Each structure stands twice: as structure tokens, then as C-alpha cells.
């Protein structure tokens, strides 16, 4: 709770985080941020727009085929332009097993461009947690099926506490 004080209470801000669990870490982070920033919105895979309770807080993008529309990008830009808090997962997908261990994939640098354009501080968040060994093995063999399997992983973690460490704002 004390680390939430790192997040500016007003004005545009971009909150970035790793993505170890999938939608569960996003929902948990959004819930925590909303407690101090009722204007917070989260950039999500457009498939999550089917979750009605998430819709008021979500800014969808098509990160499956990298075909995010201009309208979707404008919605993100408009939110920052009015001084909103924006939560992003720069990897664009859940962490997976790699030779270096369980890590996010390469981060998209769009959050840096947005921060520069809108003079928004960047607040880094390190989210803890892991999915099952089965998930990571499945993602090595059949990545699309492992993405669908994330729903099952989410229910395994439903009563767990998700740890998150919020860093100091990085200004341009």
C-alpha cells in the first residue's frame, strides 16, 4: 500500500509492468491503481473487451496480429492528453519460458514515445508470480494453445495474493 504513493495522484502517468500471470496480474494491478487514480485505464488485448466489468477501464489493442487501429491508438493518446493514468504491459503478452528463465518477451518501446510526447512520468512495477510448469511446457510446444490455457491458470491463482513492487517515477 505504501508503494502506491510512488504513483502521482494527478496528471498523466504511464505505469508499466512485467506480465508474469496474464490477465490476473493486469486485473490486480488495475484494482490497486484505481484505489488512488480513479481515472486509470489499462491497455488490454481486444479479446478482453468481452469482459463487461473491465470495459470502462480498458483501452483495447490488437496485439495478436499487430493490427492496432488508428482509433485504438487515438484512445490511448487521448487518455494521456487529458491527464489520465495509463497501465501498460510492454511485452504485450504473458511471460514465457526462455533460455534465461521465465521472462517477458521483448518490450515494445511505444510507452517511451508516449511518455516523451505527453510529458508523462513512467512508473515501473515489478509483478511477482508464476504460472504452472505445464503452461510453460505447453507454450514451448503450442503457443496458441498455451494462451487459451491461461484461463485455467487464472483460476488456479484466484485466491492468491499477487506481489507487486512499485518503483519511483522516471521523468523525461
Model-derived features with residue positions:
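Hydrophobic/aromatic ligand-binding patch that stacks against planar heteroaromatic rings
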Residues: 32, 78, 113-115
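A cross-family acyltransferase "interaction/gating" segment
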Residues: 85, 97-172
Amino acid at each position: 500500500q505504501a508503494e502506491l504513493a510512488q504513483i502521482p495522484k494527478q496528471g498523466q502517468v504511464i505505469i508499466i509492468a512485467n506480465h508474469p500471470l496474464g490477465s490476473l496480474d493486469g486485473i490486480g494491478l488495475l484494482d490497486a491503481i484505481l484505489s488512488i487514480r480513479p481515472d486509470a485505464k489499462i491497455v488490454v488485448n481486444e479479446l478482453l473487451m468481452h469482459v463487461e466489468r473491465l470495459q470502462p477501464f480498458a483501452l483495447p489493442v490488437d496485439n495478436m496480429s499487430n493490427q492496432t487501429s488508428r482509433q485504438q491508438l487515438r484512445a490511448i493518446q487521448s487518455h494521456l492528453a487529458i491527464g489520465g493514468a495509463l497501465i501498460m504491459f510492454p511485452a504485450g503478452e504473458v511471460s514465457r519460458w526462455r533460455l534465461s528463465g521465465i521472462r517477458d518477451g521483448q518490450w515494445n518501446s511505444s510507452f517511451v514515445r508516449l511518455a516523451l510526447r505527453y510529458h508523462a512520468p513512467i512508473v515501473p512495477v515489478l509483478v511477482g508470480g508464476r504460472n504452472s510448469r505445464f503452461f510453460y511446457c505447453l507454450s514451448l510446444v503450442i503457443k496458441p494453445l498455451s494462451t487459451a490455457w491461461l484461463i485455467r491458470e487464472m483460476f488456479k491463482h484466484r485466491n492468491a495474493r499477487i506481489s507487486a513492487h512499485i518503483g519511483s517515477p522516471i521523468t523525461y
